[in-house]
Each structure stands twice: as C-alpha cells, then as structure tokens.
C-alpha cells in the first residue's frame, strides 16, 4: 500500500518579519482609508516571519510579468533539485526508482513543465511520467498526495515524487489596493517542498482513502485575474468561513472509511489563515493542539500555498512521528472552493522490512520500467 514518506522543505534566505511588513504597509499606504483595518488583519494572521526569493526591495518593484516569470524559472531550477534529492534520500530511493513526478505550482508558468528539465538534469528515467498541476492553488498539495496515491494504487510497485514550488512574492501587485490584497501582502510566503510516495515499504503515512469536495458556486471566491502585469490574486472576504461547509465533507470521508473525524491521532491540513484552523477545531470538535504543525508553518513561513501540507507533515516527522497504526487526516484547501482530503495510518519501515528486502533496487528498477511500459 502507498506510503507518504518524510517531506523535504526549503525556504529562501530573504526574511521579512511581521513588524517589517506592518511598517512597509504604513509607509506605502499612508493615505489609504482602510489602512487601520488592513494592519489589524495582518496582525491577526499570526504570521511572524516569511521567506522570499528576492530582497524585499526587488520584490516591491514590478519589472513586468516577463521578467518575474524569468525569476520564477531561474529560482526554481536553482532551488528545487536539492529539495528533491533530500526527499529521495529520506525515502531510500534513487531518481531511477521514480515512475511519476507530480509538480504543483500556481505562482509561475513554464512550458514544458519543470518536470522535463528535472528528468534531464537529475537522472530520472526518460520514461518517467509527468503530471504538472498549475491551477489548484493552495489545494494542490493535497491533490498531489491524492494523485500519487491513485497512481500507486493502480501500479502497486511504482513510486511517485511530489514537488511543490511556490514563489508567492512574485505575484505581488503594487497597484492592488483592496483590503484583501493588503492582507495577502502580509500573509503569503515562498517555499519548496518534495516528498516521495512509495508503492511498497517506507516510513510515514500509509495512504488508505482519498476524496475531493467542491463547495458549489464559490469559484469566484479565490481566483486570479490574469493581466499583462501578471497574476492578480483576488480573495473574497467570505473565504475564512469556508470550514463550516467543508467540515462535513471531511467527516463524511472519514465515516466512509469507518472512522470518526473527531477522534483521529493526527491532523495535517492547509493553514491558509488562523481562522481556518480555529474553525476546523470547532466544527470537527478537535483540540486546537491537534493542528499545531499547520499553525507552526503559518507562524514561521506564512501561507506557502501548495507546500503548506507537506511542511506541516515534515514537522510531524521532526517531532518523532506517531505510534504504529495511528490514524490521521490530511487536507488541502484552495480555489473552487475545493478540499482535497486523504486518510491514512502511520507505519514504520521495520514493519514491512521483509517486503523491502525482497526487492533489490536493481529489481525494483526493472519493475518500474515494466510499469511505465504498461
């Protein structure tokens, strides 16, 4: 059964604190009639620090969509490979053991996808399948886990690599002056995450069931307005309240699996903002402490879009994981309004060691190639 292994995460070296964000807002929007409200909303996010791919002075300039997209491509090619290599090492696999790369990003555009460059540069087999996902926003982290689960269910000997690369700072638009835009300027950060889903063996979350749910008639609540200047992010004021209609979908998925969503051992969810976590605690009737990993990501990195779920899971690993067989929920939330949800149990490599030792890497690569040719 497919196992989601320890994620590798990297954030850029340029850091901006909440205090610096608030001061920038005061300086750049002195005469804005709703500045006090915007400042209060930014403070309420709880985001203490964010990491960005360029110095703040460069981020605040807008050289044009073309130049920004060049920065996206340059920084992705510079930073992603090391994150992938650590994820492969943590999963005890080689690049040639990977059968599919699922690449998610909503903050830049490349064609061919970065996956083609990665296959050429990092030694993945030329038959490696590519699944780039560009338009699911913050929900894409959960979607990538689910698509990897689906692939490994269809091909039980296969291994999937998930990569999330988000440079939200490249979407900053100095002419967007609505309160929602000012809030986003203090909420989003940049980050890269990668994780392997092994078809056999591995330590991590043994994925058992996944599902998706879209709240009807909410597709304009989170969206891009694409202009000559790039991606203009639009965030409706109703978004923070979306956990009330989404919580029943989480409960239903757990119920279909014979579980109670209010009585699980770990919760790894997208932290788009503090109210999402607070409301999930309320509507799922779960202790707020259960969402500590997601809240830590929000506090230290901000909303890093599709990479949030993987970073929160990384923090669970860093805490030492959980006991064998512990049951958990993973979920990403984003445009649509969409929830991508999965359920799984914790397993350690020792439990399935017999399986892993029966398949050498040479034999596994042979199986992998047969899967690709199927």
UniProtKB/Swiss-Prot annotation:
Source species of the chain: Streptomyces coelicolor (strain ATCC BAA-471 / A3(2) / M145)
PANTHER family for the chain: 1,3,6,8-TETRAHYDROXYNAPHTHALENE SYNTHASE, HYDROXYMETHYLGLUTARYL-COA SYNTHASE
Subunit note: Homodimer.
Listed GO MF terms: acyltransferase activity, transferring groups other than amino-acyl groups
Membership in a protein family: Belongs to the thiolase-like superfamily. Chalcone/stilbene synthases family.
GO biological process: melanin biosynthetic process; polyketide biosynthetic process
Pfam families from the UniProt entry: Chal_sti_synt_C, Chal_sti_synt_N
Biological role stated in the UniProt entry: Involved in the biosynthesis of melanin but also various secondary metabolites containing a naphthoquinone ring. Catalyzes the iterative condensation of five CoA-linked malonyl units to form a pentaketide intermediate. THNS subsequently catalyzes the dual intramolecular Claisen and aldol condensations of this linear intermediate to produce the fused ring of 1,3,6,8-tetrahydroxynaphthalene (THN).
Keywords: Acyltransferase, Melanin biosynthesis, Transferase
Catalytic activities: 5 malonyl-CoA + 5 H(+) = naphthalene-1,3,6,8-tetrol + 5 CO2 + 5 CoA + H2O
Designated name of the protein: 1,3,6,8-tetrahydroxynaphthalene synthase
EC numbers for this chain: 2.3.1.233
Pathway involvement of the protein, from the record: Pigment biosynthesis; melanin biosynthesis
Annotated active site: 138
Transmembrane segments: none
């Amino acid at each position: 059964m497919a196992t989601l292994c320890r994620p590798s995460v990297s954030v850029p070296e340029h850091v901006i604190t909440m205090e610096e964000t608030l001061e920038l807002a005061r300086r750049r929007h002195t005469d804005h009639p709703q500045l006090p409200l915007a400042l209060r909303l930014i403070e309420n996010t709880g985001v203490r620090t964010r990491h960005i791919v360029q110095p703040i002075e460069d981020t605040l300039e807008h050289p044009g969509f073309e130049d920004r997209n060049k920065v996206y491509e340059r920084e992705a090619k510079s930073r992603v490979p090391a994150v992938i290599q650590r994820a492969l090492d943590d999963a005890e696999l080689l690049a040639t053991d990977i059968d599919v790369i699922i690449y998610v990003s909503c903050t830049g555009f490349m064609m061919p996808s970065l996956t083609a460059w990665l296959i050429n540069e990092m030694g993945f087999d030329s038959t490696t399948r590519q699944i780039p996902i560009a338009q699911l926003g913050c929900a894409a982290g959960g979607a990538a886990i689910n698509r990897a689960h689906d692939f490994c269910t269809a091909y039980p000997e296969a291994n999937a690599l998930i990569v999330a690369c988000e440079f939200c700072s490249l979407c900053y638009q100095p002419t967007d002056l609505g309160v929602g835009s000012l809030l986003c300027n203090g909420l989003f950060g940049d980050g890269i995450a990668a994780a392997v889903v092994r078809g056999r063996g591995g330590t991590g979350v043994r994925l058992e069931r996944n599902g998706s749910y879209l709240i009807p008639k909410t597709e304009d609540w989170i969206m891009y307005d694409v202009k000559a200047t790039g991606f203009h992010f639009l965030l409706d004021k109703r978004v923070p309240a979306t956990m009330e209609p989404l919580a029943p979908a989480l409960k239903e998925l757990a119920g279909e699996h014979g579980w109670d969503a209010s009585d699980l051992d770990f919760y790894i969810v997208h932290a788009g903002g503090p109210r999402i976590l607070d409301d999930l605690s309320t509507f799922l009737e779960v202790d707020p402490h259960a969402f500590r990993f997601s809240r830590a990501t929000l506090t230290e990195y901000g909303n890093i879009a599709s990479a949030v779920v993987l970073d929160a899971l990384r923090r669970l690993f860093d805490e030492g994981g959980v006991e064998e067989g512990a049951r958990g929920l993973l979920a990403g939330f984003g445009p649509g309004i969409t929830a991508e949800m999965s359920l799984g149990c914790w397993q350690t490599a020792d439990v399935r060691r017999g399986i892993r030792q029966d398949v050498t890497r040479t034999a596994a690569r042979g199986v992998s190639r047969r899967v690709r040719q199927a």
